[in-house]
Amino acid sequence: MRLHRLRARLSAVACGLLLLLVRGQGQDSASPIRTTHTGQVLGSLVHVKGANAGVQTFLGIPFAKPPLGPLRFAPPEPPESWSGVRDGTTHPAMCLQDLTAVESEFLSQFNMTFPSDSMSEDCLYLSIYTPAHSHEGSNLPVMVWIHGGALVFGMASLYDGSMLAALENVVVVIIQYRLGVLGFFSTGDKHATGNWGYLDQVAALRWVQQNIAHFGGNPDRVTIFGESAGGTSVSSLVVSPISQGLFHGAIMESGVALLPGLIASSADVISTVVANLSACDQVDSEALVGCLRGKSKEEILAINKPFKMIPGVVDGVFLPRHPQELLASADFQPVPSIVGVNNNEFGWLIPKVMRIYDTQKEMDREASQAALQKMLTLLMLPPTFGDLLREEYIGDNGDPQTLQAQFQEMMADSMFVIPALQVAHFQCSRAPVYFYEFQHQPSWLKNIRPPHMKADHGDELPFVFRSFFGGNYIKFTEEEEQLSRKMMKYWANFARNGNPNGEGLPHWPLFDQEEQYLQLNLQPAVGRALKAHRLQFWKKALPQKIQELEEPEERHTEL
């Protein structure tokens, strides 16, 4: 009897020690373990420069089944369970994509290459960065990052959430989603409705709702944020009926759901292009999908190569109607949002990566016309649209430097500034909206880019994450360091409270009837009515001129 009691006591002690060990690993251990609904994950403890707290990282956690075989061009399915402890110490494979243009036109300027991750169709993973002290019950705000890349490239390993997590005491989640043809091909019918990449994002957010408490996060305080096509994704999630309730705030950096070239009402154009590129010349959409499912990784990469960007579609599921209609609908219920742009969005990165024009050469009228034609094709806009834009932005000007600045403003307004302002106007009467214009050119880029540059597309990212391309440390000036800390606090305060303002920060007013916005520069200031005269052109003059041009054509057709 005594022996039985002794064994029971020893067993209880052993269980207690094991429980303490697991709890220790879950918090301060160099080899932390956390539990998800599909199994345990081993992470790493990272010591963050400039922060008192360490951060635990859990990389490459599956949030869906690998989208292979019959799951290619199909909605994501829940992940399968695993036994034992899964290794979460290395980045996941990136989704299939063509990296040639980005590496040759952009990263080469910094003598850098992409992180040496493998590339695979099996890529539906997310990574988590959580303060080392966090535990289930910490209820920390959660910030889910959606990367940009024109919906054709990008990866989780390009971003490091450690600094944001450590300095602002938040849980950062970075997700991957299918890209290019695998992510957004559609036949426009039941055989391939499309928007697979967007559905992946929804699946990742559902996973966060189920599991983030195990990593110290609060599932009732989730903010989604993204840049460029990531901002478009965030904005699209805000209007989509199937993602409601999965997040509670949204930050759209240089990209919204109305960005031309990233949304199409019809799948016809992309479907036809893909059919031609793939040599799947079947007229029947079911046969076309079957043919594409049989293509190898190398063949899919070859089909992807010509796409510099690819649009989502009105699929009846994720987007039951065009985002503009959803934004204007009476039943639209947005979440509090930060919406913003940079003041030189088309200055350097996009023209280089998309090879629109030579950024090192002076631009004459002929070069501007050729560049405009390339952009109209990419953005799927009619030639008459381009003529009206040239008339408004460029006129008869022939001075090369002025011409280039006018062309850059025209394209930045078309793609980013005007759509962002339109979304802000749609949302601000129904939920709080905070608008910003980022204006600072990073000091470390001044020797690489033309001297007239301001804040280019993506320039705000190192200030939000306090790192550059996969965690590379940046040498900020002291003033830039202060700007970065302000921006991190604004973003994290918004994730905590739905309001970016806080102690020690310059006041950021709501975007409302007065159209006030924050100018994010070394000395932040409040501005008012950004691009007011251009917005009037886009809202009133341009639609009226297009209608006037279309009316004679309609009369001619009737005759």
Swiss-Prot record:
It is an enzyme of class 3 (hydrolase). Its EC number is 3.1.1.84, 3.1.1.1, 3.1.1.56. Residues 1-26 form the signal peptide. Glycosylated. The modification Pyrrolidone carboxylic acid is found at residue 27. It is found in: Endoplasmic reticulum lumen. Preferentially expressed in intestine with moderate expression in liver. Within the intestine, highest expression is found in small intestine with lower expression in colon and rectum. This is Cocaine esterase.
